[in-house]
Amino acid sequence: VSDAVTLLAALGGSLSAFYFQRYQVQDSQDKTQIDTLRQTQFFLISQYDRLIDINRQHFAQWKDDEQAWCSMPALLPMSYKELQVDFGKLFFLLNKNAENLLLLQIAQQSFFAALEAFNGRSEFHISHFQPRIGLLEEQNVEFKDYEDFKTKIGKRVFKTLEMATSDCFMHIEGSIRKLREASRSLHALSKEIYPNEKFSLIKDAE
């Protein structure tokens, strides 16, 4: 009887240790996933805030101006690679909601495409438009009207900068919308997985 009791006690202790260890592993995994979800939201919110600031300070005043292509100044180069979402850490969401991951990927592609559009326009503005203006000023060229100005700037410079400016407006509006959608979708999924945890999300700021 004594041996049986000892065996049962040992077995009970082993089972307790097993379940405790499994609890610790699960608890550690949950903490990692919660931190990843919160960090991802932080990146989405930060990207959104950057675009809102850029739009307010730079784009909004030129939105309905047909001369925005030449009047809107160039921006300083932007990267924000430090705000890039790490999708490797979000792999666990595949079994939860693959659609959410797709929304996140679309939002990320849109954000960095917007930055690329801003940088591309600014580079062309600095490398081609500004030198052309400088040359015309050196030659004391006068402009009769807006149409004359476009003609003397040159068709290639005008068309390229006009299209690049239009792309900037399109990208910033689309990216703001997609980041908002991705953030709200991720927030809903995060609360579904961890209902007792708190998660941030993008709030309207336009």
What is each model feature region?
Residues V1-S28:
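Membrane-embedded hydrophobic alpha-helical segments
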Residues Q41, I45-E206:
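Interfacial alpha-helical end/capping and short helix-turn segments at domain and membrane boundaries
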Residues Y23-I45:
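Juxtamembrane membrane-water interface segments immediately C-terminal to a transmembrane helix
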